[in-house]
Regions:
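Core dinuclear metal-dependent hydrolase active-site scaffold
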Residues: 2-3, 17-19, 108-125
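Active-site HxH/HxHxD metal-binding segment of metal-dependent hydrolases
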Residues: 12, 32-114
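Short Gly/Pro-enriched turn/cap motifs at secondary-structure boundaries
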Residues: 6-8, 94, 100-102, 121-124
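Structural motif
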Residues: 24-26, 48, 116
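Conserved beta-strand hairpin/beta-sheet module of binuclear metal-dependent hydrolase folds
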Residues: 1-44
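Active-site flanking residues adjacent to catalytic metal/cofactor-binding acidic residues
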Residues: 28, 52, 121
């Protein structure tokens, strides 16, 4: 398994690429659209996007990854918030969210993604 922290420009979110096979990636909190090109530079295909939360500064690259075939996963609570922050986006000059959640997960639930076992741990607050 390889985990790479990506340092975006502008809004600083903790974006990560995680891969078990060196070909398919799970992307955590893709803050910016350029995340798609950074994956391509590493010859990684975006298979899944995991969102820790749906604030605009963590989801800027989700639309591009979803259009490329990545499945978007987040908690049920965050799935309800997707697309509801247009005024906050406008205030910070960020485009509004244009994606949807493909799957949701619950606290403590484990999923297998690209050969990786991922367990959700809720940390509200």
């Amino acid at each position: 398994m390889k985990i790479e922290k990506i340092y975006p420009k502008g809004f600083a979110a903790n974006t990560y690429f995680v891969t078990a096979d060196g070909k398919n990636a799970v992307v955590v909190d893709p803050a910016q659209p350029r995340i798609f090109s950074l994956l391509a530079e590493r010859a990684l295909a975006p298979a899944y996007v995991l969102l820790t939360h749906a604030h605009f500064d963590h989801v800027g690259g989700v639309s591009a990854l979803q259009r490329a075939g990545a499945k978007v996963l987040c908690s049920e609570e965050e799935a309800r918030l997707i697309g509801t922050q247009a005024d906050l986006c406008e205030e910070f000059g960020a485009p509004p969210s244009d994606f949807h959640s493909d799957e949701t997960f619950s606290d403590g639930e484990t999923k297998s993604l690209c050969g990786l076992k991922v367990t959700a741990i809720s940390t509200p607050g």
